[in-house]
Amino acid sequence: QEDIASILDPAFGRADATQNRTPGSDQHSVAGGVIALAVGPTDANYDFTPTILLLASPIPADTTPEQALTESAVALSDQVPGFRMLDDCPWPTTPESAQLRTGIYIQGRVPITACRWAWIHSDGTNDFLLTATATMTTPAFSNLNEDVLAIIMSMEVRNG
């Protein structure tokens, strides 16, 4: 079984300390980080826990928000070995200019479907690329996709 905390803690600090965070909620806000992590029921067939991870990444001064949004699609394919993007399309609801990327990959023997929503958020001083990435086993996708959409549609990121 995946130990999400052991993956996130070295990179972002304690995973349980991410609830109710905003891009500007701590002294490391310009560096970005984990805003929220949600875990679902483990898929016993693959011993895999589905997750939704919301990240804030600062956009460098020499990069426009539009460039960051476009480049984030390429980064997704580069960051996940074997990732095959199936869709990269505008997300029809708020936030404005959001993109939805979906794809698949194999992790060991586990077939995974990933959905990533990406959009730009400003805290008034800095621009951030926000990504909400849902991962689940491909067989579980048909059972979980409505729950994931409900969570994504209810998310609200506020400045701290």
Predicted feature residues:
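Short, well-structured beta-strand
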Residues: 60-63, 67-160
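Secretory pathway targeting signatures of secreted, lumenal, and periplasmic proteins
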Residues: 1-60
